[in-house]
Amino acid sequence: MTSGELKRAKRAVRRRVLAARDATDPADRQRAGAAVAERVLALPEVVAATTVLAFSSFGSELSTLPLIDALVGRGVVVGLPVIVDGDLVGRSWRPGEPTTETWFGAHEPVGGDVIDPSAIDVIVTPAVAVDPAGRRVGYGGGFYDRFLPRTRADAFRVAVVLPEQLVREELPAGAFDLRVHAIVTPDEVIRCAP
C-alpha cells in the first residue's frame, strides 16, 4: 500500500468510526469511562506503574477522568500530552490543576513538570479505532507515532475505547505504526501481541 493509499484508507476508517462514536449517548460515555477505568486499574502493568501518560478526553471520547482520578489517588505520577513545536511531550498533571484547550479540543496542562519518556511505565493511548491485533488509527497528526518510539521498549501501551471503536477487520497500518499491547472497552480487555 502506498503512503497515499494508507492515508486514504485511514481517513475512511476515521469517518466511519467517528460517526458511530459521535452517535453514542453522552451519559453512556460517562458510564463507559468508569467501567474502563476499573478494568485498566486491575491490569498488572498498571498496578505496578509509578508513572502513567494518560490523556484528557474530549468530544465524544469516553471519559478518562475516572481513570486519572484513581491513578492520582494511588500516588501514581500522571502526565498528559502537550504538543510543543509539533512534538508530543508529557507533563505532570493532577485533577484541579489548570489546563488550556487546544485548537482541536483537547486539554493540556498549563504547567507541570516535563516527564522523561524513559520514566513512563504505561501509556494510555487515544484512538479513533483499534483492531484486536492492536493496530490503532489515531486522529491523523502522527503525534503518538513519533512519541512512542522514544519511550522504553517495555512501556505498556493500552488503548481505551468505546465498543464502537473496536473494529473486527484489520486496520490499515504502516511500518511506523506501533501497536498497543492491550485494548480496554467497558466490556472486555483484549491482550494483543504487538
Predicted regions and their residues:
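N-terminal active-site beta-alpha-beta segment that forms phosphate/nucleotide-binding
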Residues: 2-119
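Surface-exposed, charge/polar-rich loops and edge strands
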Residues: 1-8, 12, 19-23, 74, ...
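Short glycine-rich anion-binding loops that position phosphate/pyrophosphate groups of nucleotides
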Residues: 58-60, 128-132
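Short polar/charged helix/loop
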Residues: 140
